[in-house]
Regions:
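Pepsin/retropepsin-fold aspartyl endopeptidases
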Residues: 2-336
């Protein structure tokens, strides 16, 4: 995704080099549906609760937060927002400063959009993560955002080199069974999603049982059906997951990303939430998985959370962009 997104003529969306205290370490938590919630300050106020979403190319404010801050919404300066199932035009708002640790955005016109769920104030997208390193410690419920080369590497991690597409959309090689895949690292997606090309490469049955059909609702409220299948031996960053429930479909964002023709897996929080720690290093172009409990042996997961919050992203004028986060309306896949 583009870090700039779709902006008004003459505007720029780039992280400033203003340096806040380097040792930013704040409480975070995977909430009850598995999302990573972090404290963010807006125009010096807060902190407010933002969803950390590496699948969103822009930082987004909810109408509730905009009203609370007394900001002026522009319905003339709109942007096109793309989600997992479709696109929608949304208004924007001018924000002087957003900060979270060593991430600072200044003088930005940002999208304003509702989330499917009313418990977050906004979305911290990747528009400020250039040359930054994000550490999520799931054991101690901490998140750290610092400059990429200012920290010592974690011990006992498995690393994978990544590449960027459309800005800072992070992709790493992986495998599902014997099929090589593009693995998109997306902390904003509760479910792991697969495209049609991966479905066919795995030779999965054409029609899933009715109970396995999942209705996916994106931020635009457009709906698409996906088929839920259990797949074996998913390997990302040299970490193997033995059994994974994946929702497959011709989802809108795969085509926007130009990943609809190649087997692609969106790695959601149902997988990453099982780690001890996750490091996403945009400066070094790598992802790190820390798995003390799971070291050198397969892990078995079942995606049991029903995703209900979707965070929008907005496309760049010259490059497609989308956010894979989705809401699945079928019952939970396992009792929790």
């Amino acid at each position: 995704m583009s870090g700039g997104g779709l902006l008004l003529p003459g505007t720029q969306a780039a992280a400033t080099e203003t340096t806040p205290p380097a040792d930013y370490q704040a409480d975070t938590r995977p909430d009850r549906i598995g999302r990573i919630i972090v404290p963010v300050r807006v125009n010096g106020q807060g902190p407010f609760q933002f969803l950390l979403d590496t699948g969103a190319n822009r930082t987004v404010l909810t109408p509730r937060l905009v009203e609370r801050l007394g900001l002026q919404v522009s319905h003339d300066d709109t942007v096109s927002m793309s989600g997992v199932t479709g696109a929608l035009v949304v208004p924007t708002v001018w924000v002087e400063r957003i900060s979270a640790g060593d991430l600072v955005l200044e003088n930005q016109r940002l999208p304003v959009a509702y989330a499917l769920g009313n418990d977050v104030d906004g979305v911290l997208g990747v528009d400020g993560f250039a040359n930054r390193r994000v550490l999520v410690d799931f054991v101690h419920h901490k998140v750290e955002i610092r400059t990429s080369r200012s920290v010592v590497a974690l011990p006992n991690v498995k690393r994978a080199r990544t590449y960027f597409k459309f800005g800072l959309l992070m992709i790493t090689p992986g495998t599902v069974g014997r099929v090589r895949v593009n693995a998109v690292i997306d902390t904003g997606s509760e479910h792991t999603l697969g495209n049609r090309a991966l479905h066919d490469a795995l030779h999965l049955q054409e029609e899933a049982n009715q109970s396995d059909m999942t209705e996916v609702i994106g931020q635009t409220l457009a709906k698409q059906l996906g088929a839920r299948h259990q797949v074996q031996n998913v390997i990302v960053a040299d970490t193997q997951t033995k059994l994974v429930n994946v929702v497959f479909g011709d989802f809108y964002m795969f085509k926007l990303w130009e990943l609809d023709k190649e087997p692609t897996l969106v790695v959601g929080m149902d997988l990453m939430g099982a780690l001890d720690a996750l490091v996403i290093d945009y400066g070094r172009k790598e992802v790190q998985f820390q798995t003390h409990k799971l070291w050198n042996r397969p892990i078995t997961l079942q995606t049991g959370r029903v995703a209900r919050a979707t965070v929008p992203s907005v496309p760049d004028p010259t490059a497609p962009a989308a956010l894979p986060t989705s809401r699945a309306t079928n019952p939970p896949l396992s009792a929790m």
